[in-house]
C-alpha cells in the first residue's frame, strides 16, 4: 500500500474513500512508497517537513504494517542516457507530469543525494531501532482503531488520532496529532484504556504536532513495565547480564511510568549513560529528543568552513522566453538557453588540492 491515514483500511470499510479489495486481509501489510521526501519540479517547488515522513511511518506502523518501505530513503543522481537525458519532463511520454532536474534526484530524503543526513534521518532511525528491537513482538499483533466509527472527514479535528497493536496482553499505542500544512489542536484530558490498563492516572494533554509510541504491559528482564507515557525506542542486549532500555520524553507530556507496580511521575530525562531506574537486570534510560535522535551514533566530523573563491567568466545574456508545456505549466530551460547564462569559475578546497567548477 501507499501512504495514507491511520487505519485507512478500517476507514474505507466504514464508509470513507473507496472500498477495499476483498482479499486485502489475506496478505501481509507491507508498504512500498512511504514518502521519504519529494523532488521539486521546475514549476512546483515542494518543501517536505521532517515531520511529514516521520508521522506517516508511525501511522502505517500503527495501522498494522510490518514493513516500512520508502520512496525514497536515499536521494540519487540520474545517469546519462545514450541519446537523451533520463530525467522526467513534460515532453516524455510515460512520465509527462513535470520537468525535473537533468542530473540531480535530490528527493529531500532522509539521506541526501551524496549521503548527507537530513533531520528526518534521525527521527526515522528511532523508529527503525524500535522495530529492530521489538519486531518479533510487534509483527503478530493485531491493529485496533478505537476511533474507527468516525469516518475520516476533511478538516475534522475533534478527536485524537490514535491506534494500538496488541496480542491481548501486551500492546503499543501509536499517537499522531500532526498533519501536514495544518495545525491540529491540543487534545486535552486524554487517558487510554488498553489491555485492561488505564493510563496515565490523570488525564493528560497531547500537544499539537505530537507523534509517539507508548508501551503497555511490556516484560523486560525482571521489570514489568505496565505503561509509560514516554516513547519506547531501543532494548540493548549487548552487555551480557544487563539490559538497557532506552526511552524518550515527549515534549509537552509528563513522563509517567508504572514499573513493577510502582508509579513514577514527572520523570526527568537524563542522558544515555545515567539510568532513571535500575533493577538487578535492567537499566532504564529516559532521553530528551536530542539525545534520542543520536542514540548510539558517534560524533560526526563537522564540515569546516573554507574560503571559496569565485570569479565571473562571462556576463549573462538576455532573459530567455519562457514557454508553456503540454501540461499548461512553465517549461524548464533547454540546453540552448544556457548559451546566454552567466559563467562563473569556482575554486573549492578539496583535501590537498583545489576542486575547480
Specify the residue positions occupied by each region the protein language model found.
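Short C-terminal domain-edge/linker segments immediately following a structured domain
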Residues: 59-65, 101-107, 202-205
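Catalytic-core region of carbohydrate-active enzymes that cleave or remodel glycosidic bonds
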Residues: 2-97, 167
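Aromatic-rich peripheral "rim/lid" segments of glycoside hydrolase catalytic domains that contact
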Residues: 79-135, 139
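Non-catalytic C-terminal accessory domains or segments of carbohydrate-active enzymes
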Residues: 116-357
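Glycine- and acidic
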Residues: 37-43, 107-113, 240-242
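Acidic, His- and aromatic-enriched active-site or binding-groove loops in soluble protein domains
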Residues: 1-4, 94-106, 170, 175
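Structured loops at beta-to-helix junctions and adjacent beta-edge loops in soluble globular domains
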Residues: 35, 74, 108-110, 165, ...
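Structural beta-strand/beta-sheet cores of well-ordered domains, especially the beta-sheet scaffolds
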Residues: 27, 67-69, 103, 169-171, ...
Amino acid at each position: 500500500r501507499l501512504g495514507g491515514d491511520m487505519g485507512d483500511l478500517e476507514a474505507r470499510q466504514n464508509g470513507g474513500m473507496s472500498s477495499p479489495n476483498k482479499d486485502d486481509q489475506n496478505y501481509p501489510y507491507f508498504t512500498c512508497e512511504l514518502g521519504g521526501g519529494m523532488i521539486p519540479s521546475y514549476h512546483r517547488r515542494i518543501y517536505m517537513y521532517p515531520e511529514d515522513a516521520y508521522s506517516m511511518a508511525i501511522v502505517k506502523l500503527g495501522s498494522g504494517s510490518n514493513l516500512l518501505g520508502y520512496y525514497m530513503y536515499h536521494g540519487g543522481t540520474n545517469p546519462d542516457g545514450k541519446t537523451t537525458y533520463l530525467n522526467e519532463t513534460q515532453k516524455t511520454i510515460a512520465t509527462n507530469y513535470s520537468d525535473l532536474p537533468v542530473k540531480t534526484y535530490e528527493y529531500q530524503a532522509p539521506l541526501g543525494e551524496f549521503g548527507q543526513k537530513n533531520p528526518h534521518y534521525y527521527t526515522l532511525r528511532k523508529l527503525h531501532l524500535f522495530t529492530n528491537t521489538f519486531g518479533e513482538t510487534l509483527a503478530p499483533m493485531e491493529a485496533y482503531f478505537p476511533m474507527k466509527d468516525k469516518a475520516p472527514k476533511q478538516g475534522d479535528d475533534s478527536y485524537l488520532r490514535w491506534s494500538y497493536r496488541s496480542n491481548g496482553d501486551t500492546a503499543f499505542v501509536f499517537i499522531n496529532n500532526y498533519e501536514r500544512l495544518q495545525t491540529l489542536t491540543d487534545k486535552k484530558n486524554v487517558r487510554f484504556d488498553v489491555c485492561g490498563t488505564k493510563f496515565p492516572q490523570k488525564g493528560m494533554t497531547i500537544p499539537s504536532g505530537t507523534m509517539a509510541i507508548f508501551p503497555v504491559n511490556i516484560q523486560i528482564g525482571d521489570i514489568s513495565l505496565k505503561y509509560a507515557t514516554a516513547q519506547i525506542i531501543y532494548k540493548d542486549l549487548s552487555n551480557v547480564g544487563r539490559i538497557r532500555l532506552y526511552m524518550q520524553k515527549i515534549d509537552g507530556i509528563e513522563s509517567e511510568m508504572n514499573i513493577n507496580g510502582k508509579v513514577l511521575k514527572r520523570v526527568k530525562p537524563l542522558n544515555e549513560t545515567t539510568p532513571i531506574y535500575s533493577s538487578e537486570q535492567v537499566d532504564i534510560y529516559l532521553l530528551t529528543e536530542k539525545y534520542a535522535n543520536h542514540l548510539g551514533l558517534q560524533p560526526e566530523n563537522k564540515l569546516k568552513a573554507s574560503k571559496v573563491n569565485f570569479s565571473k567568466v562571462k556576463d549573462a545574456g538576455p532573459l530567455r522566453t519562457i514557454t508553456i508545456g503540454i501540461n499548461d505549466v512553465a517549461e524548464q530551460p533547454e540546453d540552448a538557453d544556457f548559451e546566454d547564462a552567466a559563467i562563473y569559475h569556482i575554486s573549492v578546497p578539496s583535501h590537498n588540492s583545489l576542486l575547480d567548477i
